[in-house]
C-alpha cells in the first residue's frame, strides 16, 4: 500500500538529507524514491519540470524547494513543532537557515564538483565559516533553540559531511563536536540516513 507522501531524493546530498530528517522528526510515513540526478525517472520528469531534488508529492500537491517543503511539513504535520512559537525565535532560526543555504551549501557543492583549486578555496572558506559559528553552538542544547528545529535539520547534514569533505573542526570547536555527537544519536537523524550517507562516517556510540 502506497503512502500519501512520496519523496524523490538524491542518495547523498545535504538539501535532500535535510528534508528526510524533517520527515523522520515528524514520524510521518512516506515512500522514499532514491533518484540518480543524471537519470531521473519518468515520474519525476512528469511531476516536476525542473527535475530538481528533493521533490515532495502529496496527492495532487508537488513541492520542490527544500525550504518550502520543510515549512510545509512543519505546518501540515504540526507535532512535534520544528519552529519556536514566538515570532522572534522563528525569525532568528530562519536567518540561520538562510545563511547555511546561501553561504555553506554552495561551498559543499564546489568541493564535490569543482576543480582541485576551486575545491581547496571552498574547503578553506567553509572551514572558516564553521569556525566563526562556534559561539552559536554554546547557546542551547539544540541549534539556537530549546527543542529540535528546522535549523537542526539544515545544519546536521552539513556537519555529518565535514570529515568526508576534508574539513577538520577548529581547535576551539568542542561545542560543535558535542552538538554533533548529540544530534547524530538523535533517532530522527539516524532514520534520515541513506545507505550511502551511513558510509561517510561512523555514528557515535
Report each predicted region and the residues it spans:
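Short, solvent-exposed turn/loop segments enriched in Gly/Ser/Thr/Pro and often Arg
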Residues: 10, 150, 196
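GST-like domain detector, emphasizing the conserved glutathione-binding G-site
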Residues: 1-130, 134-135, 141
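Residue-level detector of family-conserved "landmark" positions at structurally sensitive sites
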Residues: 33, 66, 172, 193-194
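Acidic/histidine-enriched, glycine/proline-rich intrinsically disordered or flexible terminal extensions
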Residues: 196-205
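Conserved beta-strand edge residues that scaffold enzyme active sites
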Residues: 37-38, 176, 197
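GST-like fold's C-terminal all-alpha helical module
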Residues: 96, 100-192
